[in-house]
């Protein structure tokens, strides 16, 4: 799953695009081998503020409309707002990726019913602005799994097909370094719920493991995290660097398939 942020303030400067540039980037990622591309019009990095609905729509809807008929892979909309979800699903997106797990907007569960797939993510704290203030868990794995199971049930209770749900533990969203590493180590446990989505690409916890100068310095750690997640049975890897990740996974597959 490639990442395309139609935002001026994404944490990774290499993935900040205007609408026209975003279309080109989606096409580049498709050529590089992306199986799915996630398009977002609001940064959800730690400390970020909410973007008005109209601003978010102005960023992402033109991208989806411009891609209509030009790509054969599914497109995902990364939003926590029901109106944005509805309009983007009408404009060509088929997957809804909600970092609030359908909680931020009271109408989001209903909006999600028209998506072919729904990604529910765990986020500690009330919002991206405050989620890293003081993350605390007694049992991070158990609490994340219980939360995601409850959100799937909320979707099912509203008439949604639970088979359409994918689960994201929310690496870097309201978690300390230790929380992130524990969740990654035990991804196989999370996979008992269903298909898992993981995004470690360029995130700050990688910079805590080895000295770096920022997100641009974290490709190698991102590839290591992607390969580990794949070994744990993760179905969807959310990445900025599609070509490099595909190459790393191809090498991993070759080793695993050798006699």
What do these predicted regions represent?
Residues 1-2, 28-41:
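N-terminal glycine-rich anion-binding loops that anchor highly charged ligand groups
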Residues 10-26, 44-67, 71-74, 79-83, ...:
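Active-site-adjacent loop and "lid" segments of alpha/beta metabolic enzymes
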Residues 161-164:
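Short acidic capping loops at alpha-helix termini that bridge into adjacent secondary structure
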């Amino acid at each position: 799953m490639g990442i395309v942020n139609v935002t001026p303030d994404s944490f990774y400067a290499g993935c900040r695009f205007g609408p026209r540039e975003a279309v080109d980037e989606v096409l580049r990622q498709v050529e590089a081998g992306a199986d799915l591309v996630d398009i977002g019009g609001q940064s959800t990095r730690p400390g970020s503020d909410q973007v008005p609905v109209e601003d978010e729509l102005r960023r992402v809807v033109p991208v989806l409309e411009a891609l209509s008929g030009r790509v054969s892979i599914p497109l995902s909309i990364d939003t926590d707002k029901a109106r944005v979800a509805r309009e983007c699903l009408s404009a060509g997106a088929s997957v809804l990726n909600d970092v609030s797990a359908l909680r931020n907007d009271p109408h989001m569960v209903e909006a999600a019913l028209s998506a072919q797939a729904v990604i529910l993510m765990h986020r500690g704290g009330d919002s991206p602005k405050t989620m890293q203030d003081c993350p605390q868990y007694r049992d991070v794995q158990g609490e994340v799994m219980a939360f995601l199971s409850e959100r799937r049930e909320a979707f099912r209770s509203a008439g949604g097909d639970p088979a359409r749900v994918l689960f994201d533990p929310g690496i870097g969203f309201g978690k300390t370094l230790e929380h992130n590493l524990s969740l990654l180590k035990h991804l196989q446990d999370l996979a008992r719920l269903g298909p898992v989505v993981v995004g470690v690409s360029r995130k700050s916890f990688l910079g805590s493991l080895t000295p770096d100068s920022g997100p641009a310095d974290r490709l190698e750690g991102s590839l290591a995290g992607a390969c580990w997640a794949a070994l744990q049975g993760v179905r969807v890897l959310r990445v900025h660097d599609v070509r490099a990740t595909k190459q790393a996974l191809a090498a991993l597959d070759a080793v695993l398939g050798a006699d």
